[in-house]
Amino acid sequence: MDKDYSAPNFLGESSGGNDDNSSGMIDYMFNRNLQQQQKQSMPQQQQHQLSPSGFGATPFDKMNFSDVMQFADFGSKLALNQTRNQDDQETGIDPVYFLKFPVLNDKIEDHNQTQHLMPSHQTSQEGGECGGNIGNVFLEEKEDQDDDNDNNSVQLRFIGGEEEDRENKNVTKKEVKSKRKRARTSKTSEEVESQRMTHIAVERNRRKQMNEHLRVLRSLMPGSYVQRGDQASIIGGAIEFVRELEQLLQCLESQKRRRILGETGRDMTTTTTSSSSPITTVANQAQPLIITGNVTELEGGGGLREETAENKSCLADVEVKLLGFDAMIKILSRRRPGQLIKTIAALEDLHLSILHTNITTMEQTVLYSFNVKITSETRFTAEDIASSIQQIFSFIHANTNISGSSNLGNIVFT
């Protein structure tokens, strides 16, 4: 032929390892058919176009019998190229990789099958470059999609595994909590009833012991200190009785001290001259021996001060506590007839209103407790009140021992 025509090599060059003779014979077979078709109908510009199947533009139904037989003879050679590609790809696969990620095995096999079905390289001098580029672009896009799918599958597998582990842990924690709660609340009705009866028995025993203690406490006090048989009355009466016992202790101490002072006083009276009057002798005996005072300012009491004063003599021991216009007076002395009435009258003459009176006696000793309120506008001190009470008992003692009367109205505060 005068004119050399180079047709694209569509088959036999995908791996680049086939013989030159086989490729040349295939090229000759297709070139002869293309030349005949081009001379008859096809224009010069459409000679290099590709069919959708990857072969030349000549359809298979227009090929003669000899061409078909030649194509069938070279089919086995073309198959060798595919098996070689398959062997090359299979040798590069690591089986351990499939053991680690079994989900990816199917996708890799699908990828290999797509590569076997499609030609890897299609080159020609004019039209082969276009077909090769299209095939390479398609394969690259396919590989990118497969890689993305593989990565997504791996990520989904890892995420799914972590979520499963978390769900399993949450399930186990819930089971443990449910077991603990069941263990705490798993009480039968018999156990609940037994616990309730135990509480009732303990409370009953406590009340029984409390009532027993109150009964013993009530038996130790006189009946006058307990007006009612309830718990508050018994405890209140016991407190009052203890206070009275403290006052009685003071009375006994004062009586003992008076006896000592009385003996010394008798010795002093025997040595006095006969010219001395009885009034003078009584006045000397009634002179106070101990006078003490104390002033305490109360915190938060609105500026009020609590004053305490004591005035002790052989006739009486006087203790006064003054807070504002309220005072508490305690007098410990020997029992004398008419002494209480005279004392109350003298206190009223001193403008002291008596609010409460308590009397405790033991043999010949008596303890007077007065709660009084100062009604006069004159401000008195605790020491003034104690000194005035000592004068009152001096006159009472003198009036008792000496026939005659004593004018109590002349007693004033010194």
Curated annotation (Swiss-Prot):
GO molecular function, a single term: DNA-binding transcription factor activity
Basic and acidic residues: compositionally biased ranges: 166-175, 187-197
Short sequence motif LxCxE motif: positions: 249-253
Low complexity composition bias: residue spans: 12-24, 35-49
Tissue: Resctricted to stomatal cell lineages (at protein level). Expressed in roots, leaves, stems, and flowers.
Pfam families on file: bHLH-TF_ACT-like_plant, HLH
Domain named bHLH: residues: 194-245
Disruption phenotype: Excess symmetric divisions during stomata development leading to abnormal guard cells clusters formation. Reduced seeds set and low biomass. These phenotypes are complemented by MYB124.
Up-regulation conditions: Inhibited by low relative humidity (LRH) via epigenetic CG methylation, thus leading to a reduced stomatal index.
Region annotation Disordered: where it falls in the sequence: 1-61, 142-197
Major localization class: nucleus
InterPro entries attached to this UniProt entry: bHLH-TF_ACT-like_plant, bHLH_dom, FAMA/SPEECHLESS/MUTE-like, HLH_DNA-bd_sf
Cellular component GO terms, alphabetical: nucleus
Composition bias type Basic residues, residue spans: 176-185
Source organism, top-level taxon: Eukaryota
PANTHER family recorded: TRANSCRIPTION FACTOR FAMA
Subunit structure: Interacts with FAMA through its LxCxE motif. Self-interacts. Also interacts with bHLH071 and bHLH093. Interacts with RBR1.
Function text: Transcription activator. Together with MYB88 and MYB124, ensures that stomata contain just two guard cells (GCs) by enforcing a single symmetric precursor cell division before stomatal maturity. Together with SPCH and MUTE, regulates the stomata formation. Required to promote differentiation and morphogenesis of stomatal guard cells and to halt proliferative divisions in their immediate precursors. Mediates the formation of stomata. Prevents histone H3K27me3 marks and derepresses stem cell gene expression.
Note: Plants overexpressing FAMA exhibit ectopic stomata.
Designated name of the protein: Transcription factor FAMA
